[in-house]
Amino acid sequence: MPEQPLKPLDLLTGLRTLEVEFIVIGGYCLAAHGYVRGTKDVDIVPEPEQANLQRLLAALGTLQAEPLALGDFDAGELLELNLENLRLGGNWLLRTRFGRLDVMQYVDGLESYEQLRAGAVARDLPGLRYPLLFAGYDDLIALKQAAGRPRDLEDIAELERRRQA
């Protein structure tokens, strides 16, 4: 499947329709804290229990998700997207019919899903029947500091500037 334009609401609806539990992190999460900027993907941290991973796998099927080969890897070298491999943890960079989805089960700066869940904020988005959970402000800052990329550091500065305004 060729790369599709990002349609985040359709992507997130596809996950929530099958009752997948997850928390949005990354660039799309910035909007939950008053800062909107462009992003090429949606990053989520799924709740790691097997039943949720089964729902996630079913949702990924409806989204026509397939692993995205990056760098020196080609498609034949990637793990198959199945429950056994999802349960191994790790991160999945996926191409879907609604754009790119990064399923992050290991994230620098994050101790556990439970920690992230404890600080998460719920937001209602237009067109969605369910509120979505987004990383809380302090967790988002910590995740971006741990990533340390120039874009993340710019995001931190902008979030802090807006918080002080």
Task: Mark where each language-model region is.
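Compositionally biased terminal segments of proteins
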Residues: 1-165
